[in-house]
């Protein structure tokens, strides 16, 4: 892992992502997670190209749920080495809950998979908010940030209105409404968070885009036509959200940092 992590730090530096404090485990785990997300995206794309448009893309292999969840699991492992203890305590469960949601949404044969997957991601968003909220309180927001928050709230309300007539059929009115509120709160908190880079904010918007496509596919189209772009947007979301936390920052003197190996 040491050689992978060293190579990862060099790659990140060449990409212009500074790593002033990133331990080897963190940088290496983040890069390996990115490769896992890329690999699953390619796998999903190949399946989609072999099937008629709108076909179900999950349930094609016994290990597909584990494959899908591997990116978030690896990001959680990387987050264990995050030097800022308060953020680490929120990020690790957020990513493990995301992995749980990935797993559940990859087992379509279970009737309750969507509802429990929704619940797992709802809790993940609350954990992300826990990590982001102190960063959003550090200074008065700029007009641009406020405008982005307003746009996010308007878009979320519009989606809920669009989905609303279709939610009662599966008794999902309350769960989906609560989820959209939590997702919107997470994205708005990310847009307001004071971080050295824009990656976390961009990642949060990608998360909203991914979940919006899930809702459109399930409640409007009634098929899996958007499954491939959903994954790519979601993978970008998790990678970018964590990049904003992990890289380009200085460690506060009072941070409880795990030892680097």
Swiss-Prot record:
Activity profile over pH: Optimum pH is 6.6-7.2.
Major localization class: membrane
Protein name: Lysoplasmalogenase
EC numbers for this chain: 3.3.2.2
EC primary class: hydrolase
Location relative to the cell: Cell membrane
GO MF entries: hydrolase activity
Keywords from the UniProt entry: Cell membrane, Hydrolase, Lipid metabolism, Membrane, Transmembrane, Transmembrane helix, Virulence
GO CC, any one term: membrane
Matches recorded under InterPro entries: TMEM86B-like
Cited function: Specifically hydrolyzes the vinyl ether bond of lysoplasmenylcholine (pLPC) and lysoplasmenylethanolamine (pLPE) to release a fatty aldehyde and glycerophospho-choline or glycerophospho-ethanolamine. The cleavage activity is specific for lysoplasmalogen substrates, and there is no activity on 1-alkenyl-sn-2-acyl-glycerophospho-ethanolamine or 1-alkenyl-sn-2-acyl-glycerophospho-choline (plasmalogen) substrates. Confers a growth advantage for mycobacteria in host macrophages, possibly by cleaving toxic host pLPC into potentially energy-producing products.
PANTHER family found in the cross-reference section: GH04784P
Activity-regulation annotation: Competitively inhibited by lysophosphatidic acid.
UniProt family annotation: Belongs to the TMEM86 family.
Catalytic activity: a 1-O-(1Z-alkenyl)-sn-glycero-3-phosphocholine + H2O = a 2,3-saturated aldehyde + sn-glycerol 3-phosphocholine; a 1-O-(1Z-alkenyl)-sn-glycero-3-phosphoethanolamine + H2O = a 2,3-saturated aldehyde + sn-glycero-3-phosphoethanolamine
Native source organism of the sequence: Mycobacterium tuberculosis (strain ATCC 25618 / H37Rv)
Misc remark: Overexpression of this gene in M.smegmatis increases its survival within infected human macrophages. Overexpression also protects the M.smegmatis spheroplasts, which are cell wall-deficient mycobacterial forms, from membrane disruption/lysis by pLPC, by rapidly catabolizing it and depleting it from the media.
GO biological process, one term: lipid metabolic process
Taxonomic placement: Bacteria, Bacillati, Actinomycetota, Actinomycetes, Mycobacteriales
Top-level lineage group: Bacteria
Bilayer disposition of the protein: Multi-pass membrane protein
Ranges annotated as spanning the membrane: 29-49, 65-85, 90-107, 111-133, 146-166, 172-192, 197-217, 227-247
């Amino acid at each position: 892992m040491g050689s992978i992590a060293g190579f990862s730090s060099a790659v990140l530096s060449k990409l212009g992502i500074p790593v002033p404090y990133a331990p080897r485990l963190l940088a290496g785990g983040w890069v390996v997670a990115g490769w896992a997300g890329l690999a699953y995206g390619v796998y999903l794309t190949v399946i989609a190209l072999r099937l008629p448009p709108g076909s179900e893309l999950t349930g094609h292999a016994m290990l597909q749920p584990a494959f899908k969840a591997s990116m978030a699991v690896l990001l959680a492992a990387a987050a264990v080495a995050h030097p800022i203890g308060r953020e680490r305590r929120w990020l690790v469960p957020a990513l493990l809950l995301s992995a749980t949601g990935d797993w559940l949404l990859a087992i379509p044969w279970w009737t309750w998979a969507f509802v429990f997957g929704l619940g797992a991601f709802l809790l993940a968003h609350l954990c992300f908010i826990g990590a982001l909220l102190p960063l959003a309180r550090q200074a008065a927001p700029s007009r641009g940030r406020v405008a982005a928050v307003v746009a996010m709230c308007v878009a979320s309300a519009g989606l809920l209105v669009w989905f609303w007539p279709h939610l009662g059929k599966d008794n999902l009115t309350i769960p989906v409404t609560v989820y959209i509120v939590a997702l919107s709160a997470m994205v708005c908190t990310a847009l307001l968070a004071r971080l050295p880079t824009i990656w976390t904010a961009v990642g949060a918007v990608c998360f909203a885009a991914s979940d919006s496509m899930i809702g459109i596919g399930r409640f409007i189209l009634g098929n899996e036509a958007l499954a491939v772009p959903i994954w790519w947007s979601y993978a970008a979301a998790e990678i970018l959200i964590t990049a904003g936390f992990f890289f380009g920052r200085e460690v506060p003197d009072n941070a409880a940092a795990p030892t680097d190996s």
